[in-house]
């Protein structure tokens, strides 16, 4: 029953309804052509050089590059931080970093990041099943205790970072992961929360090539 305002008028109904799962109900997906992919020939030389290098290595251009290239300054900032987190030195293996991306992106319902980074995870792990298992329910995936602890921490950062407590850090420490490792885990989860939301908001879709990689 609608409530009334101070002057007896019916209060406006909320514009957003919650589903049974507690998430806002959804309309049609964002059309990808609202933010079209950039034309390679129109980009600054440094962006073109990076994208061509990716194309030569992968055999195709992942859509994230051409979508973000619409704004060159943001492209540079995004990939500088991405590279620092995902390719820099640190206590986490490359596969562990990709697991974080897949698990937290699944929580955020980001099709692009789950599919794209799931492909990379399959390659690093040499396991055609692992990405699906981590995305659907990592707690049931055949993972070592260290990986499970990493994903527990990462998913808590993704869903309820204010609830993190000393016990969360202590559990990581039990698996040889100190405060700096926890920083890395949190940084990846937080960075990809940004990536997930931009992918969803821009209508970014995974390239078909990703689905076949590592199978």
Region annotations inferred by a language model:
Residues 2-215:
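Hydrophobic alpha-helical segments
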């Amino acid at each position: 029953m609608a409530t009334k305002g101070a002057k007896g008028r019916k209060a406006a109904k909320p514009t957003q309804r919650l589903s049974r799962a507690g998430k806002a109900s959804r309309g049609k997906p964002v059309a990808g052509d609202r933010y079209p992919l950039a034309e390679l020939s129109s980009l600054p030389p440094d962006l073109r050089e990076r994208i061509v290098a990716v194309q030569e290595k992968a055999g195709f251009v992942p859509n994230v590059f051409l979508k973000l290239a619409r704004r060159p300054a943001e492209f540079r900032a995004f990939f500088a931080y991405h590279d620092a987190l995902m390719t820099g030195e640190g206590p986490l293996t490359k596969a562990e970093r990709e697991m974080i991306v897949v698990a937290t992106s699944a929580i955020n319902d980001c099709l692009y990041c789950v599919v794209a980074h799931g492909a990379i995870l399959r390659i690093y792990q040499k396991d055609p099943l692992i990405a699906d298992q981590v995305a659907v329910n990592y707690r049931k995936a055949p993972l070592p205790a260290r990986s499970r602890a990493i994903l527990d921490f990462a998913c808590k950062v993704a869903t309820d970072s204010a609830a993190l407590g000393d016990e969360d850090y202590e559990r990581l420490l039990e698996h040889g992961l100190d405060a700096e490792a926890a920083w890395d885990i949190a940084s990846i989860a937080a960075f990809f929360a940004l990536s997930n939301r931009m992918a969803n908001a821009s209508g970014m879709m995974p390239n078909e090539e990703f689905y076949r990689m590592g199978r």
